Amino acid sequence: MKMALDVEKEIAGLKAQAEARPGAKRKLSMVVFSGDLDKHIASMIIATGAAAMGMEVVVFYTFWGTAALRDPSKRVGGKNLVEKMFGMMLPRGRDMTKLSKMNMAGAGTAMIKAVMKKKNVASLGEMFDLAGQLGVKIIICEMSMDLMGFKFEEMIDYPGLSIGGVATFLADAGESAVQLFI
């Protein structure tokens, strides 16, 4: 299981990084900027791995990453033309995200999802469910939501999902032993 070994190596590296900063909390603060499927998968593997190791985990979704948090079943009115255009052009939820490389008009995305299923790797939706169960906190960037015309009411149901700004993230990251940008 090469993927499992890679994840274990990544988690061991995070643990070493956390222990190298005395005074910092056993905490991971992560920015998810990308809207790509593979990067969302990586962020959830790292977040759930760190939470399973007993670390506090906060994930700050900003810019293109915020689209993955949209709930495809929720519709919100009252948007202007630009906001409607962003809504139409960006993925409506995590299941609509695409690979950053080798997407091949969606064939690559379908293949990676099939391989994950065949190898009993949790889907992105299952990873989000696990993250919620493990207490991973998710904060959505308020400015990104405003720029793209997203409303909190159209976001996924996730325990403790909140909105915050860059100051919220920086205060959180300042006390964290590990910070990542994906």
Model-predicted segments: where are they?
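Glycine-rich, aromatic-bearing surface loops/beta-hairpins
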Residues: 140, 145, 153-182
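A glycine-rich helix N-cap at a beta->alpha junction
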Residues: 77-116, 120
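Short, glycine-rich nucleotide/cofactor-binding loops
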Residues: 30-41, 69-70, 115-119
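Glycine-rich loop at the start of a catalytic domain that most often binds anionic cofactors/ligands
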Residues: 69-79
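Histidine-anchored nucleotide/phosphate-binding helix
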Residues: 41-54, 59
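Long, leucine- and charge-enriched amphipathic alpha-helices
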Residues: 1-24
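Short internal beta-strands
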Residues: 57-63, 139-142
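Ligand-binding beta-strand-loop-alpha-helix segment within the catalytic cores
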Residues: 117-143, 157-160
